[in-house]
Amino acid sequence: MRETAPGAVRMMANRLLDTNLRQGTDRAIGAHYSYLCPSPHVYKWQRFWDSCFQAIAIAHIDPEQAKSELRTLLAAQDDDGFIGHITFWGAKLRGLPHPSAYGQSRPGERLTHSALIQPPMLAQAVERVAEIAHDPAFAPPLMAALDSYHNWLAENRAPDADGLLVIVSPYESGADQSPTFDEAMGIRGRAGRWRLGFKDRWLDLRNWLNDYDPTKMLGAGHFHVKDSTVNALYADSLATMARLHRRQGNDQSAAAYVGLASHVTDSMLIKMLDRSDAIFRSLIGREERRSEPLTVLGLVPLILEGIPREVAAEIAERQLRSHDHFSLRYPVPSVAASEPSFDPRGTGLIWRGPTWVNTNWLLWRGLQRHGEAELAGQLADATVAMVAQAGLREFYNPHSGQGLGAESFGWSALALDMAESS
């Protein structure tokens, strides 16, 4: 009997438990860890939003490991609530991190975690894993840590009255080399790998010289971006926290989160929504110049329940259904096909054309929330077929579906959640 695409993806996800699982006790951090590395050959440390996505995927295979993944992420949390975008579990045993990691960590934290954030996906992962595992008791013990994390974000990365988070490095967006950030990085014209790499390391050095202190970095403004994806997931995370608190009878906390989520969403609609092109645009610099390239980062705000239905419908029609922009054979490309920077093979630089499963999953969720069931189903089917055909790869050619980048890539197993839930 021929194996179905969902069945093939399930088998691939199951193999991650053999190839990507890392367990042990870290004496530097003082905690036990059990997580899936994003890719055993390329990315061996725990990464923030990778773990959030991987937990959702693996919950369909091993719910207990999915819970351990998220508990491990929280085990490295600082006392003030901060969680770094990379945690170097077992570094003394596995060897030192890549040299670039030193430039993204404070002195004294080099064998524990980085000093950068990633898009807030933790609350959503906790909620989804609890749903898949049918375990309402999973979230309550984590709420204090989740509250502390969200408090840190609001107090340290939202300096203005609009409530929007500011990122201080393109790595904090999770889409490191997206052309969305070329202007903020001082890139004019074509961005080469070595040129952008030098700019990245130079920015790391400047942030390191500011001790990765949020006040100093925001004051210096070397990289000051209110990113559309980071803030969409922030607002979505706040709304998720409201639901989690409400389920536990914490109505006052729930109301506070609802208010903040609404405020951030309203600010995005006012400042970021480009109605002429039906896309959200990141804000560059203190002047809040709108980013110009059409990228998937401007579509992720579809995840927000608070955006008007007509706005969501316009984005779906003019962007996701457009063959000139994002409706390719294996959607959704990270950059619109109409953009000069579009590279479907990801040659040299990533996030400049290939399709990524994590953003597909976010868009699929957003389309479902806004009544675009047919388009959501088409996206799920294409994503599952792509992964079944090419395997768990880091990203994919949107024309051919060819798998590219790292192999045994954990978050691409999100296709399983799309298959199981569609």
Question: How should each PLM-predicted stretch be described?
Answer:
Residues 105-117, 121-132, 362-366:
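Hydrophobic/aromatic-rich effector regions of fungal transcription factors
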Residues 51-81, 297-308, 360-373:
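Alpha-helical support elements that line or immediately flank enzyme active sites
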Residues 4-16, 62-75, 135-154, 237, ...:
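Extended, well-ordered alpha-helical scaffold segments
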Residues 51, 119, 123-126, 231, ...:
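TPR repeat positional signature
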Residues 2-45, 70-112, 162-226, 263-355, ...:
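Extended glycan-interaction surfaces of carbohydrate-active proteins
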Residues 118-175:
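Internal, well-ordered domain-core segments that constitute the primary functional module
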Residues 123, 130, 235, 239-242, ...:
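Heptad-repeat amphipathic alpha-helical coiled-coil interaction surface used
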